[in-house]
């Protein structure tokens, strides 16, 4: 009974981890882990994605029903807590559980609309509610970050900063993201200037210097992004090697430092989900207001000036589509802004694109799928490991071009 709440919080986290795995691969060997077993080394059995979703909804429902908020958590509270996500705040875990439930409900809205609405309404109408602010963002902090920022004061730097300065400078903007930053509003999306450098020599970027070139993205499938030369043509992620040794420095001018947290689910996403839920008549409220709230929440996270936020919102080219009678046009705008806000969580952006076909991405420049993915189409899932090719229980016909 002492660890009652801890048990159910781990179930919430487990459902979150399962969701990422099944959305990446489809059917997965879930039954072993649900039973607390290690799977055999060969010939494992797979659980269908439908049954995996059933299991996730069950885990979340049991956790939300059984957690006792007045008991708190025994992981310590605040910045020194062993809880790397929410600092021992049980109410934030409950709001995350509901928000995750809504995400999963929307994920199945095209294949099982009745179940999706049932689960979505439970999430929205729960006593504990959804995320309330950016303080509720589900995130993890790198070990290298100081203790007062949620880290351990040392250890690995497992984040985007390490990728840009440790792994060859190949983290550059996509052409699709460039298009979204430039074309959604009459003004450049202010998040672009926070997250990306202008194309510049890598040696200059090490000194936090950039050119006056326009921001530029790389087309999907371009195989010429090799090493440090890539930053001369395309915009790399905005970080500064000069502050990498100062783990206390979280400078908004160089967003991706070694101490920067990684956000897995945000308050902004929850507002965009409410916009879609209202569009589907799962809840009341203004679709357009939820949509605007999502944009504002995303920009608030990056501490963007109010005047820049308002100029961007005032300049939105298709805002009228969100409040219009054409639900497909409204969905397109909601998901496009959601996709922008989700960066750099690529897995979630990919999952939303596969679900909705939004945003409208540019054609792939080079298809290297060996026929798995039809020309002009996009990858739908990741292949199972090669070691599974001899497993008679492996789902048949599941290639990268199949949902």
Q: Where do the model's predicted regions map?
A:
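C-terminal functional modules
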Residues: 296-403
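Structured, solvent-exposed acidic/aromatic patches
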Residues: 1-301, 324-329
């Amino acid at each position: 009974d002492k660890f009652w709440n801890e048990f159910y919080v781990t179930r919430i986290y487990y459902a979150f981890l399962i969701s990422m795995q099944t959305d990446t691969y489809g059917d997965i060997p879930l039954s072993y882990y649900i039973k607390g077993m290690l799977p055999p080394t060969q010939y494992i059995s797979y659980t269908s994605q439908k049954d995996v979703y059933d299991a996730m909804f069950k885990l979340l429902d049991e956790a939300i029903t059984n957690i006792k908020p007045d008991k708190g958590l025994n992981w310590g509270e605040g910045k020194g807590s062993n809880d790397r996500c929410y600092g021992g705040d049980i109410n934030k875990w409950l709001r995350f559980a509901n928000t995750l439930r809504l995400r999963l409900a929307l994920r199945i809205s095209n294949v099982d609309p009745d179940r999706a609405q049932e689960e979505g309404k439970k999430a929205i109408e729960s006593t504990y509610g959804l995320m309330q602010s950016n303080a509720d963002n589900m995130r993890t902090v790198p070990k290298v970050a100081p203790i007062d920022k949620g880290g351990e004061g040392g250890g690995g730097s497992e984040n985007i900063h390490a990728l840009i300065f440790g792994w060859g400078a190949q983290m550059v903007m996509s052409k699709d993201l460039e298009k979204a930053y430039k074309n959604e509003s009459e003004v450049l999306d202010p998040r672009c200037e926070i997250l990306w450098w202008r194309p510049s020599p890598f040696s200059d970027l090490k000194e936090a210097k950039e050119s006056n070139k326009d921001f530029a993205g790389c087309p999907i499938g371009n195989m010429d992004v090799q090493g440090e030369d890539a930053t001369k043509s395309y915009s790399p992620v905005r970080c500064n090697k000069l502050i990498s040794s100062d783990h206390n420095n979280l400078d908004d001018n160089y967003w991706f430092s070694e101490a920067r947290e990684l956000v897995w689910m945000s308050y902004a996403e929850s507002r965009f989900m409410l916009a879609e839920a209202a569009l589907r008549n799962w809840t009341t409220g203004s679709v357009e207001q939820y949509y605007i709230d999502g944009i504002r929440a995303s920009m608030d996270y990056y501490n963007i000036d109010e005047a820049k936020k308002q100029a961007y919102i005032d300049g939105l080219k298709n805002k009228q589509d969100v409040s219009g009678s054409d639900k497909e046009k409204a969905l397109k705008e909601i998901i496009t802004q959601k996709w922008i806000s989700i960066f750099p969580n690529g897995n979630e952006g990919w999952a939303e694109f596969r679900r909705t076909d939004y945003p409208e991405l540019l054609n792939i420049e080079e298809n290297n799928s060996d026929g798995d993915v039809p020309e002009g189409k996009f990858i739908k899932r990741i292949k199972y490991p090669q070691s599974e090719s001899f497993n008679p229980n492996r789902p048949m016909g599941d290639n990268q071009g199949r949902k």
